Amino acid sequence: MDHKYKVGGYVKLAKLWERSKDAAVAYHSSYYVEKFRDDADKRLVGVYIDITGNKEIYKRPEMVHLLKDCKNGSVNLIFSQTRAYLAANTCDFCFLLQYLFDMSMRVDIVTDDDDQRIDTI
């Protein structure tokens, strides 16, 4: 089956989750598998989970990994439960958008945020 979207699920958790890392990774991985299990247009490529106190995008290894996968064409849809997982502030979020827009291929962003719909960007 050929899927239109290759999804990378992203989660950024606070450093305090380090103690419960295995449970957090299992929960979020399961969330994304269930979310895209029966979606004919989307195939889950991977779940990228940062557990860190670092707010800057370049200091989050899994976010950097996700962006590299976007750049090489492995991922063309970033899905996050909330915009806050993607960037700590508006400046970082704009940097992320500019980086994605400058790529040669289209990469979309979708969140589950009910009050902050960014999936039309």
What are these regions (language model features)?
Residues 1-121:
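Short, structured surface patches at the beginning of a domain
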